Amino acid sequence: MDEKELLKKAFKYGNVPSNITYCFTEPCPMKDKCIHYLSALYKNEETDRGDAIFPNALKNGKCKYFAPLRVVKMAWGFDKLFAEMKVKDAPSLRAEMRDYLGSKGQYYRYKLRQLKLLPEQQKYIKQLFARYGYKDVEFEHFSDEIDFTKI
């Protein structure tokens, strides 16, 4: 499934953030790759208000709000990460992960799929495990999804 189809599907099933910013600037040369413009095309018919990027944001063919439509491999689930670990390493690794993710509650949201890890977060966590000597660690679940972090 290509990026645009994934975005359409996200709107169809309501899997888009409520704070998305739409763009309706037809003459923009980057519109076919911009998540703001494509979101305006695929939004639900019931959506009749929201934040927008105004046409005057486009200057000399460039827009400072341009954000590319990007599909990323999201991850969640930590049980596999800790499966082969020495008991003595687990508490300190969990503590460092909680610190990185923001809190104990956030840690469990990522563990239980309420939140999903971006590739950058996955990389950091794998590097954290590597510092303890665990090189081939994997998360339990993955899915290809639209990156809504730059909206």
For each feature predicted by the language model, list its residue ranges.
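Residue-level detection of the helix-turn-helix DNA-binding "recognition helix"
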Residues: 39, 112-113, 130
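A short, Lys/Arg-rich alpha-helix, primarily the initiator
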Residues: 67-94, 135-137
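N-terminal cysteine/histidine-rich coordination modules
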Residues: 1-66
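DNA major-groove recognition helix of helix-turn-helix/homeodomain DNA-binding modules
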Residues: 120-137
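Short alpha-helical "recognition helix" segments of helix-turn-helix
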Residues: 91-100, 107
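Short C-terminal boundary/hinge segments that cap the last helix of small helical domains
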Residues: 132-151
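DNA-binding alpha-helical recognition surfaces that contact promoter or target DNA
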Residues: 36, 109, 127
